[in-house]
Amino acid sequence: MPIQVLPPQLANQIAAGEVVERPASVVKELVENSLDAGATRIDIDIERGGAKLIRIRDNGCGIKKDELALALARHATSKIASLDDLEAIISLGFRGEALASISSVSRLTLTSRTAEQQEAWQAYAEGRDMNVTVKPAAHPVGTTLEVLDLFYNTPARRKFLRTEKTEFNHIDEIIRRIALARFDVTINLSHNGKIVRQYRAVPEGGQKERRLGAICGTAFLEQALAIEWQHGDLTLRGWVADPNHTTPALAEIQYCYVNGRMMRDRLINHAIRQACEDKLGADQQPAFVLYLEIDPHQVDVNVHPAKHEVRFHQSRLVHDFIYQGVLSVLQQQLETPLPLDDEPQPAPRSIPENRVAAGRNHFAEPAAREPVAPRYTPAPASGSRPAAPWPNAQPGYQKQQGEVYRQLLQTPAPMQKLKAPEPQEPALAANSQSFGRVLTIVHSDCALLERDGNISLLALPVAERWLRQVQLTPGEAPVCAQPLLIPLRLKVSGEEKSALEKAQSALAELGIDFQSDAQHVTIRAVPLPLRQQNLQILIPELIGYLAKQSVFEPGNIAQWIARNLMSEHAQWSMAQAITLLADVERLCPQLVKTPPGGLLQSVDLHPAIKALKDE
């Protein structure tokens, strides 16, 4: 088949595979467009879980007649125009592909009117070339998008839709998340002609706890501790539930936003859990609704097809900032619940200095020379839209990072000479659920950790190996097999073929599927941790190992595979280390309580401190 340019409709349908996963994905993209248009009221009508109809009506600025056709074209957007705009995104949408992708897998109609126009115009795309037809229509200022018969022309995608109830529950969850992000917008959601959700806009300065309680429940509201934390270009606002009263139902409430964009970020979750670890049980999770605001130049939102994840340029600073903010609130132990009425409430008590409120940092204390001037300033209420799109944001932020981070972690100067601490073996507490805070990377593959004033070194390759072993070891159900795009065919000896046949059931539990004939074996599927490995080398070595065994236990095979996997990281970064430890603490909590040999080594600072004191 010769190389050729794909037809526009087919190209859009391929793009829709990433953008449009299910009806909830359509709702998310369209509602975010309404918010970017400045809408203060959004009405969402759903029929049959979104498979039949999705209608989004807003009172935003609208789209001009001359731009309606462009709105349905690929890579057409009003939100960015240059690389500089892409590196400092403040809008929710920016790629200009959502409407084109949605219209290629549904019957989409776009009706809009601007305040300057006397009449509205309606546009829709059809045919193989996605030609856009524009005609006059009746419509107030704003935009209405109707998506009919989602996936009508892609039966393979349509058959993967779940039940009507399940799909609507996903839509409902998306609306809940958006309603928590924008308290200033009225949002109405109806299903099959019945109003299901009504979130009224909260006036500026009004009580946002009513909407918080409507979405997260009264139980969360009663245990919620308000956070207002600011340092430099970083601001953290929101609520975190008191860990002492967290229940399994509350633990499902985990909403995080970065510059108003809903996120699922492991670095942020790890920082929050680390701050709550002393008060949470082994099987408990923190409950929170948090809003992080950061200079847009310091965060990359263009790293995930559905924009569910971000990448921070200064991940260490962000992680420790969130950790200190949550920890300070928990240490204050506010006992008064959030108000349930509209009576004026006293202003929250200001926090004089980040580091003091969060407790002493024993690691930074020897370097402290003088107190740091308070830098906390009151900030607007959580969840509100930024007043200005970072007019003073400059790329020079990185040059200031060292000074900002030093001030964030510095402690006031001691009033009297400190005595050198007695030597002791730093050990993790029996009820600890965290290795501690990552300070830096040493010798490219070791993480320097701090916990309760104790310093230790953790071997990242060893932690990665233990994590892979847990991921490969089957539990109550076999490990999920990932089919290979191109099956691997290898020549084997009679002895190796016999060993493979004996180990077939054990390998199947590990997610390894193969088929053998006279002199060859064809590997058809492997578990996820093996997908990025060089299978041309690993599989023959695995076959050689199995040929020497007489008993085939899945656990032993998983252990051998984990020891022989090549690491994906030759040079570890702070973000990679924090992500790895978050996964290890979640999947391998026993390693935190009883670290095996070669994983964790305590560092005794006593000789160095004593040498400094004796000088």
Swiss-Prot record:
GO cellular component terms, alphabetically, are: mismatch repair complex
Quote the InterPro entries the UniProt record gives.
DNA_mismatch_repair_CS, DNA_mismatch_repair_MutL, DNA_mismatch_S5_2-like, HATPase_C_sf, MutL/Mlh/PMS, MutL/Mlh/Pms-like, MutL_C, MutL_C_dimsub
* MF GO annotations: ATP binding; ATP hydrolysis activity; ATP-dependent DNA damage sensor activity; mismatched DNA binding
Specify where the region named Disordered lies, as residue ranges.
363-397
Report keywords, A-Z.
DNA damage, DNA repair
Q: Where is the composition biased (Low complexity)?
A: 364-391
Q: Could you state one GO biological process linked to this protein?
A: mismatch repair
- Record's superkingdom? Bacteria
What does it do?
A: This protein is involved in the repair of mismatches in DNA. It is required for dam-dependent methyl-directed DNA mismatch repair. May act as a 'molecular matchmaker', a protein that promotes the formation of a stable complex between two or more DNA-binding proteins in an ATP-dependent manner without itself being part of a final effector complex.
Which family does the UniProt entry place this protein in? Belongs to the DNA mismatch repair MutL/HexB family.
The protein's name is DNA mismatch repair protein MutL
- The organism is Shigella boydii serotype 18 (strain CDC 3083-94 / BS512)
